[in-house]
């Protein structure tokens, strides 16, 4: 009997950064993992140490790339960069506070980013959610139809908003963009792909305790 061929994708959000803690918009600004971010990535790496990754693909931004490097550890496998899975660009709003207590964004409707993301109006030099969905879809569809990847297990290191955009290729209800919230730092979504059909095996799984959770909206949400 022929072995069933399946591709397994581990789609992970990067570890914590100082801007995550401060509630500032990161977008495509190249922030670094903080100490806790490195620790969370190591905890996640330990949990995934038996996973037979053939290779990794990462956003070129350091916070995703270092997370991927930590998770791949001493596996001697390639790590490729792909700009299509970097975070949504917030343009001139990057670095600004986006929580109630530190709000600096020059728009009264930034809350659409959470409440109605597909109608979110970005800064003039920023990106819409639709644009993000288009580039991540192109990446995802190209990946899952590559003949030579059909039996591979692949690590994909990305970002909060970009991860949700990637998963629109998997979710049955694409009108619900956030599926609850921005994924936590180092949250892992595991997707199985057979014959170009995707199925979510694990959603937003974290391998660390509740005391380490920092939600995008602040620690108490």
Feature annotation, model-predicted:
Residues 16-67, 125-137:
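Loop-to-helix element that buttresses phosphate recognition and phosphoryl-transfer chemistry
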Residues 45-110:
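Phosphate-coordination/substrate-recognition cap region in phosphate-metabolizing enzymes
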Residues 160-164:
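GST superfamily/GST-like fold recognition
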Residues 10, 80-82, 201:
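General small-molecule cofactor/ligand-binding pocket signal
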